[in-house]
């Protein structure tokens, strides 16, 4: 057994694929880092965080986005009003509402479009809200009385999620931090304009030319996220997000140009073949070195 273990340790590498949403890696992870040979991450943001705590090899492979089929559901199947310019934000309460920051999306929408304007619509697609009743009530209190805002809290099939993304016009994420931001990338791959906080992992694929990046201030997390001692995150400027929402709704050519750039760039940067080749290249190097 000792001989087999020794031989295996000479040939095999133990690699961990980790995600994290803040610039500071939790101290509770340090022991686990010691047990692996190298780390795989999906963004430069995560890579930078790990480089502060380890000198082990880090391979960066952005998450691939493939041309997945959706379920074929249409706007009416989701209760979306016909002919209204529709914004979408989706999140899971398990991912910590303070980080996802849905309240900022509501505030930006209502600042952008006073109540007298009824040609716009906002969908907040959440899941697991029933497990966080206090936070769910706070969100409901923001949207009550505004018939233009639709809050759907349910777990639906991934193919239905893709259909909902297709049915909406713009995706908005005023997150305080993201390790990568897969939902943003998925919407961009569909040619949807995306408005998002210009900080953290989504900068792996979002630029000033293929999306609308919202400026922010960095502020202490102050205990609003697990294992966040000493960390900071972004506070997006809601007024600037409101300006972006208004412009995309009122300027179809601008929205189309942003969406086309998004589709093109994500199709190149996050192509499945590109991720596969990076992994194969690293695997070949490990085998050659052994």
Predicted regions and their residues:
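Single conserved hydrophobic/aromatic residue that forms the stacking wall/gate
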Residues: 1-8, 12
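A short, well-ordered alpha-helix in the C-terminal region of glycosyltransferases
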Residues: 240-243, 247, 254-268, 285
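Nucleotide-activated donor-binding/catalytic signature segment of Leloir-type glycosyltransferases, i.e.
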Residues: 134-163
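Conserved donor-binding/catalytic core segment of Leloir-type glycosyltransferases
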Residues: 81-100, 106-110, 122-124
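Nucleotide-sugar donor-binding and catalytic loop/hinge architecture
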Residues: 71-87, 114-117, 289
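C-terminal alpha-helical cap of glycosyltransferases
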Residues: 272-290
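Aromatic "clamp/platform" in nucleotide-sugar-dependent glycosyltransferases that forms part
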Residues: 176
């Amino acid at each position: 057994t000792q001989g087999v273990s020794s031989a295996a340790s000479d040939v095999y590498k133990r690699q961990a694929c980790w995600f994290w949403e803040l610039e500071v890696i939790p101290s509770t992870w340090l022991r686990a880092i010691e047990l692996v040979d190298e780390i795989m991450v999906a963004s430069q943001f995560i890579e930078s965080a790990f480089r502060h705590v380890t000198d082990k090899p880090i391979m960066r492979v952005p998450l691939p986005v493939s041309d997945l089929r959706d379920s074929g559901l249409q706007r009416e199947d989701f209760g979306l009003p016909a002919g209204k310019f529709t914004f979408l934000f989706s999140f899971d309460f398990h991912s910590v509402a303070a980080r996802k920051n849905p309240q900022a999306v509501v505030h930006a929408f209502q600042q952008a479009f006073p109540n007298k304007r009824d040609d716009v619509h906002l969908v907040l697609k959440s899941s697991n809200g029933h497990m966080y009743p206090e936070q769910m009530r706070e969100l409901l209190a923001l949207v009550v009385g505004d018939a233009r805002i639709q809050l759907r809290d349910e777990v639906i099939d991934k193919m239905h999620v893709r259909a909902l993304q297709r049915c909406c016009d713009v995706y908005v994420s005023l997150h305080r931090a993201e390790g990568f931001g897969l939902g943003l990338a998925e919407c961009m791959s569909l040619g949807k304009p995306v408005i998002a906080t210009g900080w953290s992992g989504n900068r792996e694929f979002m630029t000033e030319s293929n999306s609308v990046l919202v400026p922010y201030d960095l502020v202490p997390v102050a205990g609003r996220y697990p294992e966040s001692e000493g960390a900071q995150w972004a506070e997006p400027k809601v007024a600037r997000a409101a300006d972006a929402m208004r412009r995309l709704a009122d300027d179809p050519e601008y929205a189309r140009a942003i969406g086309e750039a998004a589709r093109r760039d994500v199709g190149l940067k996050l192509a499945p073949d590109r991720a596969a080749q990076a992994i194969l290249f690293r695997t070949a190097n490990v085998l050659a070195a052994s």
